[in-house]
Structure formats: structure tokens, C-alpha cells
């Protein structure tokens, strides 16, 4: 089963076991995911379910999107996401909730990492800085040489240099679900997940067996 849910990162806290052990957890709010389209091999070439979550003002929905949501008879959400399916059956208008998961289950969480803007090599690639003294004047944080001379006469592709850091899709694998709160639509996942508070995250059953 590869189907998951789309949630919103609420932040981190901690909970205590009966033995008094502190467990750091990330709270993910999973509003009911509404199915907007069910794709089949006959019509689309593969089996998948398309969902939306949250709400969006009507003035922020294009006519094409409004028609797509109206056809499925669901309220417009803040986006659409797709999950490949095995033998599961869904129909437009169905809802997928946190009941899909249970405590102790391992999941993969995908989100967009925090954007850091333009960053140097020390922040971006963990380069070590150069000497603060001993004749070094203005090169304390420079990366140093980026290649050779006439041969090969170019900088190799993939060279670690300064550039944009963050704001990219990141997946953290094999996190444990500590608690499922179906009444408040919350998932408590052990550890940290990518992205800023309030960002969208995708929670799927873990692809790899732990250990």
C-alpha cells in the first residue's frame, strides 16, 4: 500500500511514556483528504487517487480548478496531490483520514525544507574555515581552489560551491508514529520532519523495513 495523506506541520513538542521517558515528536494536522479524481489503467494508464486538503477562497481558484473540484463534488482545497494505488478502490468525494495509520507504524514524511537563500560553502557544504591569522587577511570563509589549470581547463560538474540552499523536496524515512488522535485529526511522529511550521507534508507508509 503506497497511499498516504497530506497534512500540515504544526510544530514540535514532547510526550512522556509511563516510565517517564521523554520522546520528541512532531505534530501533524491531517484534515480529511478529499478525493478529487480516481485514475484507472483504462482511462489514465495507471492506478492512482488524486486528493485535496484544506480550503481555498473562491476568488483564488481558477475556472479550470473550480470545474475540476465541482465535478468531484468537493470543496476547493489549497492544492492537489496524487498517490499511486494497488488494489484499493476509491471514488470522487471519498475522504481519507488519519485512521489510515496506527500507533507504532513506520512512515516516510516528505516536505519542503526551509529556504536559506544564497549561502556560502561553509553553511551549505560544511567546509572548514581558513586561518583567522598567520597571514590570512580576507580569505577566512572562501572555498579555496575550485579546480586545476590548463588541464582540464574547466570546473567539473557537481563541484561544491556557493549557491541557493534549502527550499527543496526532502523525505525523512522510517519515522515512528507515536500516537494517532482521530478526534483532533492529529498524527504525532517521533523526531523531526522537513519544512517550516505550517508547511504541507506528505505522510506515507515506510518504503523500507527498519533494521
From Swiss-Prot:
Pfam families: Ribosomal_L3 (PF00297)
Residues forming coiled coils: none
Modification N5-methylglutamine, positions: 150
Biological process annotations from GO: translation
Post-translational modification: Methylated by PrmB.
Gene3D superfamilies on file: 3.30.160.810, Translation factors (2.40.30.10)
Keyword Ribonucleoprotein among record annotations: yes
InterPro entries: Ribosomal_uL3 (IPR000597), Ribosomal_uL3_bac/org-type (IPR019927), Ribosomal_uL3_CS (IPR019926), Transl_B-barrel_sf (IPR009000)
Assembly behavior: Part of the 50S ribosomal subunit. Forms a cluster with proteins L14 and L19.
Function in brief: One of the primary rRNA binding proteins, it binds directly near the 3'-end of the 23S rRNA, where it nucleates assembly of the 50S subunit.
NCBIfam families noted in UniProt: L3_bact
Similarity comment: family membership: Belongs to the universal ribosomal protein uL3 family.
Protein name: Large ribosomal subunit protein uL3
Originating gene: rplC
